[in-house]
Amino acid sequence: MPTRIVPALACAGLALICGSRAKADPDFGYVYTADIEEPDETELTLWATHRAGKGEGHYDAQDYRIEVERGLTDRFQVSGYANFAGHHVRGLSGEFEPVHRDLAFQGLSAEFKYQLRSPEKRRLGIALYAEPGWSRISKVTGEHATEYEFELKAIVQKNFDNDRLVWAANLTLEPEWEREHEEIGPGTKSRETEKELGVELSTGLSYRVAPRFWLGAEARYHSVYPDWTHGLRRENYAVSAGPSLHYDGGEWAVTATFLPQLFGGPGRAGSSLELDDHEKTELRVKISHEF
């Protein structure tokens, strides 16, 4: 187990014994549901994601997010994020330079989520989501770069078997503008801005196997379109899927999802995986507390 994510898992173990009352619906590691925080309720969430494996050399990265979520009305909630990152990169070719950084402030983002229809009473739940963000460290390479993004998400959710089985799916569009701080000559730095569009389809299914425990699976398709304002040309894609576990203790909740990449393209010689913009495996743990 990656040592850098052990503290998050230790906190998760502590959270397992702190709860009091269970909620109706589960949380997923990557897939969003159409549920909305109740008015005047606040939730604090720690996200910890470990990404590893590029097919050569050594690559491991950690993404940490501290989220404060607040319900404003019966249908609208807002969140603020402080993002941190760690990268350990060596022996990779292409755009990857050696990076050894345990933890650094990465950037800020905000979330706005509006529920069009609740998933209660066996209806199809629908929600819309927007997340503007700013980053000072590239998520993939770990190098310093100024990035602006605007994530847009359509969310659907359907509950079955008296809410014991929950299905959710997301369509995500994420335009991004990046300016790398690259030195191209003595005292001269590149100021070129690159545009990129990420397109993602994700889905999750979770079943309540005990009063507080949910067991399920998640799947994700993610693709990248460079210079998207001049036409859509897919540069690469990756498909990942894996198990998801959620524990709801009332005020405390813990979610863990493991997503290995199944296949992608274009793959490198002798591999069916896309390892330029994606990794071999991802492990995410989320710890939430309501107050």
Which sequence ranges carry the predicted segments?
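Low-complexity, intrinsically disordered short peptide segments enriched in small/polar/basic residues
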Residues: 2-3, 14, 69
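Local alpha-helix boundary/kink/capping signal
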Residues: 13-16, 249
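Transmembrane beta-barrel domains of Gram-negative outer membranes and organellar outer membranes
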Residues: 23-290
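Bacterial N-terminal signal peptides that target proteins for export
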Residues: 1-9
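Cleavable N-terminal signal peptides
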Residues: 11-12, 22
